[in-house]
Regions:
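Short, intrinsically disordered low-complexity segments enriched in Ser/Thr with adjacent Pro
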Residues: 4, 26-28, 34-38
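Short cysteine-rich clusters marking metal-coordination/redox-active sites
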Residues: 59-62, 79-82
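Cys/His-rich microdomains that often coordinate metals
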Residues: 66, 86, 126
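Short linker/helix segments within small regulatory modules
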Residues: 68-77
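A short beta-strand-turn-helix
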Residues: 92-109
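Short pre-active-site segment immediately N-terminal to redox-active cysteine/selenocysteine motifs
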Residues: 107, 114-118, 161
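Typically the conserved alpha-helix immediately C-terminal to a functionally engaged Cys/Sec
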Residues: 121-136
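Non-catalytic, surface beta->alpha helical segment in thiol-disulfide oxidoreductase systems
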Residues: 161, 167-197
Length: 197
């Protein structure tokens, strides 16, 4: 089940829950040794393990698959494996080796900026993309893929001009937009793409 920015799950995804798991005070969410109550802990999952009512999110630092209850997404969850924030308000750097892991395995929609360092419009749009990422996470994961370094991925998605933005939900492309955008325009486009699909 994908998390929508403009839908009924948006409130759950964006609200900040004041209480923390038992015995954890105001610190980061971490698994407990005792049997947890539903929706109170984060878990790492291997292939084929059930996620139940949790949103699958790939850690931007260790690429581990983490299960987070939907109502806890806005709580600043941390990866139980590497203990870093799952969302830090900055786009994730993707490459050929981690692209499929982040795009195909995440229940949270992923907005990918296909760019190159020599591209002036790409460099001009980078601050707007980072600003929108900081404002819209955790409703969507924002990521960047350098097409010079990951030519196979760019070719697989038929990237012919850069920057090109693609929104993925459940591993499939749901929206595409070539060309640079200002932050307000980019935020509208991402919100519309997430609410349509």
């Amino acid at each position: 089940m994908a998390l929508l920015y403009a839908g009924t799950m948006a409130a759950d995804a964006l609200k900040v829950v004041a209480d923390r798991p038992e015995g954890k005070g105001s610190g980061p969410l971490q698994p407990r040794a005792s049997a947890p109550k539903s929706g109170t802990t984060l878990d790492t999952f291997g292939a084929g393990e059930p996620m139940n009512d949790k949103q699958r999110i790939v850690c931007q630092h260790c690429d581990g698959l983490v299960g987070v209850p939907a109502e806890r997404l806005g709580d600043g969850p941390r990866c139980p494996k590497c203990h870093t924030p799952l969302f830090d308000g900055h786009p994730v750097e993707l490459n050929s080796s981690n692209f499929d892991q982040h795009v195909a395995r995440s229940d949270v929609p992923v907005v990918v900026d296909f760019w190159a360092p020599w591209c002036a419009p790409c460099r001009m749009m980078a601050p707007a993309f980072a600003e929108v990422a900081s404002r819209m996470e955790p409703a969507a994961r924002f990521a960047k893929l350098n097409t010079d370094e990951s030519q196979q991925v760019a070719a697989r998605y038929g990237i012919r001009s850069i920057p090109t933005l693609i929104v993925f939900k459940g591993g499939r492309e749901v929206a595409r937009q070539p060309g640079a955008m200002a932050s307000a325009q980019l935020m509208r486009w991402v919100s519309d793409a997430l609410s349509r699909s």
